[in-house]
A protein has these predicted regions:
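Structural marker of alpha-solenoid helical repeat scaffolds
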Residues: 30, 64-65, 98, 132, ...
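Position-specific recognition of the canonical hydrophobic site in helix A of tetratricopeptide repeat
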Residues: 12, 46, 73, 80, ...
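PAPS-dependent sulfotransferases, especially Golgi type II membrane carbohydrate sulfotransferases
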Residues: 164-166, 170, 182-185, 197-208, ...
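Phosphate-binding active sites in nucleotide-utilizing proteins
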Residues: 279-384, 392
C-alpha cells in the first residue's frame, strides 16, 4: 500500500478527520493522486458535517477517475444525506454499469430504496449484500430496519418478528455496532423481558468503546431501566449517553441558533410582509406544525394526515433547508431587502419550494411537521397565502426531559445533549415565538399537548375548523394508517392517543440541574 495512503488510512480509523482533510487536500492536487485519496477526503468531510463539500470532492474525483466504482457508490451515500435522490440514483446506476454485484453499490441502492419508501426493494438489496459479504455490519442492521419500516407500513406482525430477528443477529455478530442496540431498545419493552438489557450491560463491561459507540448503548440502557421504573439507574445512563454524545458535537451550536434568530428578526423588522398580487404565489394549502422537538408534533401530524386529500411529509427538510442555506447569504438577503427585486424573488421562492412539495404528491393539502420551522414563521406567511401554522406546546419539564433522554440523528439537534444547551435553546425558541406572536397573533393556532390528549374530540374539532378541513371521528384511527413516519420512537407512531407521558418528568426532576429552572 502507498505509504501516504497507509498513514492517512490510520488517521481516518482513529477518527482524526481534520488531519485527513488537511493531508488529502494536498494529495488530490498532486501527481501522486489515486482514487482512495478522494474517498478519504470526501468521507472525512462528511464526518464533520460538510456534506456539500464532500459531494464536490467526489465529483472532482469522478472526473479524474470516471471508472472508479468506489467514488460513485460513496457520492451516492452523500447525495442521499443531502436528499438529492435523483442524483443519488444516477450515481448508483452508473456504478452498477461497472459492476452490478459490487456490495458497496448494492448497499447504497438499499439505502436509496429506503429513502424512497420502497421497503421491499430495500430488503432485497440488503439481503444481496449480506449474501455476498456476511461481514457487512451496516447492511444487516439496515436489513432489520427495513423490515421494521415495512412492519410500520403494513401493521404486519410477521415483519416486526423479522426486524427483531435480524437486529438481534446483527447485535450478536457485530457487538461493536451499537446503533443496533439503540434501534432494538425502541422496539422492546424491558419490563416484560430483560434479556437484551443484560446483554448490553455485559457488552459495556467487556468491550472497549469510543464515545460514538457508547452513546448509542447508554441511551438504550436508559430506556430499558425506565421501562422497569428504575428511574435513578435510567437517569445515570441517560446522563452518560448525553455526556458521550456532547463530546462529539459543535461547541458553538447555541451561538449559531441565536445568530439565526437575530438575522431573521432583522429581516422582518425591515421587510414588506405582503406582495401586491398574492395570486402569483403557490396556492395549495400547506399546514406547518411547529414547536419544540418532542412536544407532540408527530401526534398532530398523524391526526391531520389521516384526513382526506392530505399528504403528511413528516419532518420535511424542503422548507427549512432552503432558509438554513440562505439566511446568511448576502445575495439572498439583498434581493429580499431591495424593493425593486423583492416581489419577483418572493414569487420565485414560493413556487420553487411549493413545487418541491407538489412533485411528491398530487394531494391538495400538505403537512410539514418540522419543529424548527418556528424560525421561519414570517417566511411561511409571506410565501404561502393559504398556509396554516399550528404551534403545539407541552409541559416544559416533560418536554425537556423527553429531549434529553432521546437521541436524534440530525446534526441540527446537537444542542440537545447538554442540559445547559437545552435550557438556552428553549429561551431562544420562546423569544422567537414571542416575536412572531406580536406580528401574527391571530394567524398562529395555539394548542397544548395535554389538552389534545385529554380532550381529543373537542380539541381536534377546533383544530380542523382552523385548518378549514372536515372533521370526522375516523381521524382517531390514525395509528392504523399505512404511512410510515420516521421519528425518535417508532413504537409511538402506531399507538392510539395515550396520556401516560403527562407529568413524566416528575420521576426525574430531582436529578436535573438547569432544567428545574424552567417554568411554563
Amino acid at each position: 500500500m502507498n505509504k501516504s495512503l497507509q498513514e492517512i488510512d490510520k488517521l481516518f480509523k482513529k477518527r482524526k478527520y481534520n488531519q485527513v482533510i488537511k493531508k488529502t487536500k494536498k494529495l488530490v492536487n498532486s501527481k501522486e493522486v489515486i482514487p482512495p485519496f478522494y474517498n478519504l477526503l470526501g468521507l472525512s468531510l462528511a464526518k464533520i458535517g460538510k456534506d456539500q463539500e464532500s459531494e464536490i470532492c467526489f465529483i472532482e474525483g469522478i472526473k479524474k477517475f470516471p471508472n472508479e466504482i468506489s467514488l460513485k457508490s460513496n457520492i451516492a451515500l452523500i447525495q442521499l444525506n443531502l436528499k438529492k435522490l435523483k442524483e443519488a440514483e444516477k450515481s448508483i446506476n452508473d456504478a452498477l454499469k461497472i459492476n452490478d454485484k459490487d456490495v458497496y453499490t448494492l448497499y447504497a441502492l438499499g439505502n436509496l430504496k429506503r429513502d424512497q419508501f420502497k421497503f421491499r426493494e430495500a430488503i432485497d438489496n440488503f439481503k444481496k449484500v449480506c449474501e455476498i459479504n456476511v461481514r457487512f455490519p451496516k447492511a444487516l442492521m439496515y436489513l432489520g430496519q427495513s423490515y421494521l419500516d415495512l412492519a410500520q407500513e403494513t401493521n404486519d406482525k410477521q415483519f416486526y418478528i423479522l426486524a427483531e430477528k435480524n437486529l438481534f443477529l446483527s447485535s450478536e455478530l457485530f457487538p461493536e455496532n451499537t446503533p443496533v442496540d439503540y434501534t432494538l431498545s425502541t422496539l422492546l419493552n424491558y419490563s416484560e423481558n430483560n434479556i437484551h438489557q443484560k446483554k448490553m450491560l455485559d457488552k459495556i463491561n467487556k468491550l472497549t468503546m469510543n464515545d460514538e459507540q457508547k452513546y448509542f448503548i447508554y441511551f438504550a440502557l436508559g430506556k430499558s431501566f425506565e421501562d422497569q421504573k428504575k428511574f435513578e439507574q435510567s437517569f445515570q445512563f441517560i446522563k452518560l449517553a448525553n455526556e458521550s454524545k456532547n463530546k462529539l458535537v459543535d461547541k458553538d451550536i447555541i451561538k449559531s441558533e441565536i445568530l439565526r434568530s437575530r438575522n431573521v428578526k432583522k429581516i422582518f423588522d425591515n421587510i414588506q410582509t405582503k406582495i401586491s398580487n398574492s395570486k402569483l404565489l403557490f396556492q395549495k394549502k400547506i399546514i406547518f406544525i411547529i414547536g419544540l422537538p418532542r412536544s407532540g408534533t408527530t401526534l398532530l401530524h398523524q391526526i391531520l394526515a389521516s384526513a382526506n386529500n392530505t399528504y403528511g411529509f413528516g419532518e420535511s427538510i424542503i422548507f427549512t433547508k432552503f432558509f438554513e442555506n440562505n439566511i446568511f447569504n448576502k445575495s439572498f438577503l439583498s434581493k429580499i431587502l431591495e424593493r425593486k427585486t423583492f416581489e419577483d424573488h418572493i414569487v420565485n421562492i414560493s413556487n420553487e419550494i411549493g413545487g418541491k412539495y407538489e412533485s411528491i404528491t398530487d394531494k391538495n393539502i400538505f403537512i410539514d411537521k418540522m419543529p424548527s420551522n418556528f424560525y421561519w414563521v414570517g417566511f411561511i406567511k409571506l410565501l404561502f397565502p393559504n398556509s396554516k401554522i399550528i404551534h403545539i406546546s407541552r409541559n416544559i419539564k416533560d418536554n425537556c426531559l423527553s429531549i434529553y433522554k432521546n437521541m436524534f440523528g440530525a446534526r441540527d439537534m446537537d444542542w440537545s445533549y447538554s442540559e445547559s444547551n437545552i435550557f438556552k435553546f428553549v429561551m431562544n425558541y420562546r423569544d422567537m415565538m414571542s416575536y412572531w406572536k406580536d406580528k401574527y397573533q391571530n394567524e398562529i393556532y395555539e394548542i397544548k399537548y395535554e389538552d389534545l390528549v385529554l380532550n381529543k374530540e373537542e380539541e381536534t374539532k377546533k383544530l380542523f375548523n382552523f385548518c378549514d378541513m372536515d372533521w370526522n371521528e375516523k381521524i382517531f384511527d390514525f395509528y392504523k394508517n399505512v404511512k410510515t413516519i420516521r421519528t425518535v420512537s417508532v413504537n409511538q407512531v402506531k399507538k392510539p392517543i395515550y396520556t401516560s407521558s403527562i407529568d413524566s418528568s416528575s420521576n426525574y426532576t430531582k436529578f436535573f440541574q438547569h432544567l428545574n429552572r424552567l417554568e411554563d
